[in-house]
Amino acid sequence: MSQSYEAGNANMGQGEDDEFDGYFEDFDNDIMPNSNNGQRVGTNAGLSFNDEVNVNDDDFLDIYNMSPRERLMHNIRKNVQKLQFYFYSLRLWQQIIIVLLGIMLMIMGILLLVFHNAILHKVVVTSNDLREKMSTHFILMVLIFFVAFPPMIGYSLLSTTTGLIYGVSFEGWVTLALGSVTGSIASFVVFKTILHSRAEKLVHLNRRFEALASILQENNSYWILALLRLCPFPYSLTNGAIAGVYGISVRNFSIANIITTPKLFIYLFIGSRVKSLAESESTGSRVFDLVSIIITLLILSLTAWLLYFKTKKRYLELQNRDRQVSTDQLPELSFEV
């Protein structure tokens, strides 16, 4: 009887140990999930592009001892490595397209340097001819409308072209605003209803969109939407990604797009300066136009990136809060001897 009692206690103790070990094994899995083959994340198995790049980040102490110049060069090298990793992770046909586009851009840059006077003169003549045609308004609005759908590109080019044709005018702003607002709303509705699964994939496309989604889940008012529309996110992809966030209404999204339409005057201004640069013959006027374009782009980029870093900071705060809540909700373990 004594032996059976000791055996029973041993089995009970073994069961408690198994339950205890199983609890912490589940806890470790929540913090560091396993890959498909049962190995830890440290092997880089099953990681996305963003996760795998962040695994190899340098320690803080290594960067802390660097001079400002060394930090700059370090960040440049790290970004180049990220681009190389992303390029080699693409399929062969995608790599070929990127290489061909790079060659085309290089050829266009060389032609622009050699024949810049003739090209600028042709731009002025063409823009004046397009302004005289009544159909130009409709064509521009249709093109701007369609580039609002992911994965279309060319919104900035079309917006600047509108400024090149109409300058900083109410006429140009109405054309650009109508195409932008209607295209964004239509893209949002399509991805919210018909292509919702695709919209959810766009949310997880990179960490910026995930940060955007986390902010909108906390507060999806049209003011927050308007601020996020000013962040440096791709125009068409943002329309689709916002549609993948639960709780955002078409009404709030529409109001946010209308509120941000004054930003479109920046594109009109840049386009008007490009045309003035082409029309001017004096070196002083061209330098002034070029400096105006650069300053405007710097202000726009600085404002957009400040908003983005504010968004990223808020995203990290939400992550820390959720992690703290999860830790507080863990069951308390009592150890009795």
UniProtKB/Swiss-Prot annotation:
Function: Golgi membrane protein involved in vesicular trafficking and spindle migration.
Stretches assigned to the Lumenal side: 1-95, 159-169, 273-286
Region: VTT domain, residue numbers: 163-274
Membrane topology: Multi-pass membrane protein
Pfam families tied to this protein: VTT_dom
Organism this protein belongs to: Saccharomyces cerevisiae (strain ATCC 204508 / S288c)
Protein name: Golgi apparatus membrane protein TVP38
Residue intervals annotated with topology Cytoplasmic: 117-137, 191-251, 308-337
Listed transmembrane segments: 96-116, 138-158, 170-190, 252-272, 287-307
